Amino acid sequence: GLEEGVVTPGTHYPCSMGYHFGRNKLGCHAHKSPVDFEESIMMSCNAYYCYILRDLLENKKYSTIGVAMDRWQEYVKSFGFGQKLGSDFPSELGGFIPGSGYYNKVYGKGGWKATTVISLSIGQGEIGTTPLHMANLCATIANRGFYYIPHIIKDSENVRIEEKYKERHYTMVDTTHFPKVIGGMYRAVNSGFGSGGTASIAAVKGLDICGKTGTAQNPHGSDHSVFICFAPKDNPKIAVAAYVENGGFGATYAAPIASLLTEMYLNKEISEDRKYLEERMMNSNLMDRVKVRRR
């Protein structure tokens, strides 16, 4: 949205528990309204991203919604989505990012519009991705617009690291736009409880963790808890994606787990004031939320 000029850091959009279109609604949680760009990330406002996708797909600079849709697809794929990243992880999956061809096949050419695909704006709908893709997205944001192909071995005296793992892969989004995204992620974690930030539970003193919560809808049971983060804010050393099946809101399980991993990696220990959180995560059991299909 920033790259296309359909939104600026100062653009405000309203949110009344979601994005309303016709008799339908893509839901959101209660928070202040309206919100600007950074606040939308800080407060995890679904409606904000619905407005951005709508304005992108209905942008008059594109001759048809199909052309705009394919432009959106190009942007998303430039972050590594919808394809195998080429890592040395076993059984890597490529995922799926839909374009106009997909929707023309499903609905017929001219048979769909922005509201038909509005759930794409929050990473749902027909989007298929993996935790590796999400961790790579987080690393890309931390790097202000580029990523390295993920691989298992960071360094070794006896193993030569292939050159492809040292090459930078740049996105289609200019590096000047990433500080505002990072600002929102920083505020999501470090604004303090009661501020509206959805990831205050992930704050660790001195680490400047930047993160974004997510809740993946699950038609077969409790929603999945999702969180991505990197740290520190400047000169980052680690990026994490946590996905907890049936965990509910991102701040409930994924954010605590990811922040504990980040803290241990950077500090080599868990601080005393967060030991309770470590114990709670280690002793949690979500098996009662899993629906078993009987044959």
Task: Put a short name on every predicted segment.
Residues G1-G247, R289-R295:
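Beta-lactam-recognizing serine transpeptidase/beta-lactamase-like catalytic domain environment
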Residues R160-K164, R168-H169, I257-R295:
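Short, gly/Ser/Thr-rich active-site loops of penicillin-recognizing serine hydrolases
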